[in-house]
Amino acid sequence: SGNFKIHRFNSSATFAVNDGGSAGGSNTVEYLVVAGGGGGGGQIGGGGGGGGFRTGNLSVSAQNYSITVGGGGSRGVGGSTPGNPGSQGGTSTFSNISSAGGGSGAGFSQGIPASNGGAGGSGGGGVATSNNTASGGAGNTPSTSPSQGNNGGGSSPTRASGSAPIAASVGGGAGAAGTNTNTANGNNTGGAGAASSILGSSFTFSGGGGGGALGTATASSGGSGGGG
């Protein structure tokens, strides 16, 4: 684009730098490294966290740089009690820049006090299942500066153990944390993703996933930028 060349990698590959910049040029590249999102939990599960989002500038020299593109995490298995959590998304890397996969969404587990969301680039959503509050998974794990993501949403217990309605919480996104979900009502939205214009136009990446629901509760939708 203009004096710039855009390289986009949707799968793992090698970025080959053949020559350094001229005396009047630059040896710096702008990068955006996005990890895979976390899988949602099974059996009225919490939303998966958005994949880690890291952007900045990096000096390069004439050599090959390995690119790893992390895939999305697997969903938790439903139709059973306890429901299984999803799995963490895959890590994406460029040179020494690493973005962590999104945290797993919690699975619903009747008879267990609470199921917390998993940690990751952004954290997964939790599910409260009795008189205890579930926590969202920690975002920006491992810690980076600037932060690669935000926490997942927690879930507050507002019903008797094991009774409907039940609603799970949402995953965090690169642009905003997942907000806590009222277990009896649901109807929340996953954490918003973060925008980047590195591809020439503005796109949003790494939104948090929505949470499931049962009975009269309303399932939560995913956040902008990829949350499902």
PLM regions and their residue ranges:
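Glycine-biased low-complexity/repetitive sequence motifs
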Residues: 1-228
